[in-house]
Amino acid sequence: MENQDLNRRSFLQTIGATGLLVALPDAAFGARPERGSIAHETAQSAPDVEAKPQYSINFAVCGMSHDHIYGMIGAIQRGGGTLVAAYGQEPEKLSAFTKRYPDVRMVTSEEAILNDKSIQLVLSSTIPNQRAPLGVRVMEHGKDYLSDKPGITSLEQLTAVRKTIAETHRIYGIMYSERLEVKAAVKAGELIQAGAIGRVIQTINIAPHQIVQGHGDAGGGTGRPEWFWNPDLYGGILCDIGSHQVDQFLYYTGSTEAEVVASQIANVNHPDHPRFQDFGDMMLRGDRGLGYVRLDWFTPDGLGTWGDGRLFVLGTEGYIEVRKYTDVAVKKSGNNLFIVDQKEARYIDCNNLTLPFGPQFVADIVNRTHVAQDQAQCLLAAELVIKAQKNAQTVYLKT
């Protein structure tokens, strides 16, 4: 075999020197001839999806510590919601909020929101460890709740949330925006449910983030507050940004039961904040699929956006890759979906799709349904990341 390789290499070098190399077929280099076609397409929403909202509700904001609140408001407004009141505590957040929504009534206490019987839904992006206790109070006052992620940061909070849901029959939503508010992620779900890649075997989520951003509502446009560095307050890296990814694992695999196989966390490069976690990963096992998640806070400035979020879904008949926020060194736009099946490879531009979450969530509030977000799945995602965080091995890398 070694002599054959040497003879082949010598032959290629000889004909390369004589200019004959370009005439050889790809098969001479071990490449297979093309077998599958390649297609590019632009996904469009069905006409009924783009119709005006079917329902209307009044909603309020109670806590705006993270700028995710703006995306949450936008989703509910697209669904037919009217923002009627808001409450916040941080002066700089209040100033930015009132500039964006000058006509919204600002109140001076949480109670003013909770006791207003005209309000059906409360949104909050308050400090993470305060979100679940607020949600319990909201539900006890007969209102539905939509929290920024992480919506729950301890098992004790989770028990209280489940108990209150059972007693009040209210909705406790968590905005897992990396699936619910990403058009390509929505399209991936549609393809998977249609059987485009067969039965899902595994999901892999790569979720880099950026601490300091130049602009936008992802959280770092104006620097990070003190609570951002304290895992007691933000929940830890697996509980916080990992919640997006575990939601996707459950949704795409269809798992209703799952466990954390292994998890680890580290502070690799932030010695000034010794309790902060800038890296974490976890492995999951569900009753209908497997999952792996990697998280970090190391997005470099050269990327041009806050993170190169990737989703990979392996199926028995094909696979899907979603490049959510950019296509590195190719184009800046996100919502890029790639699918390979038994017939062809396709690229799908998903930017023209309409996001369904807002209208669906508002309809759920009116109709007492769970179309936008399955309640059990929502809370299972929270439970898994809390357990992953609680049981994670802390890793110390040598410098």
PLM regions: where:
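Short acidic low-complexity segments
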Residues: R105-N115
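Contiguous beta-strand/loop segments that form the cofactor/metal-binding neighborhood of enzyme cores
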Residues: H40-V49, D247-D327, F357-R368
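N-terminal secretory signal peptides
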Residues: M1-N7, A31-P33
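Active-site loop of classical SDR/Rossmann-like NAD(P)-dependent oxidoreductases
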Residues: D67, Q89-E92, I348-P359
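N-terminal Rossmann-like dinucleotide-binding module
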Residues: G19-V22, F29-Y101
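C-terminal helix-rich "cap/oligomerization" subdomain common to oxidoreductases
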Residues: Q13-P53, L121-L123, Q360-T399
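Predominantly a Rossmann-like dinucleotide-binding segment in NAD(P)-dependent oxidoreductases
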Residues: Y55, D67, I171, L180-H273
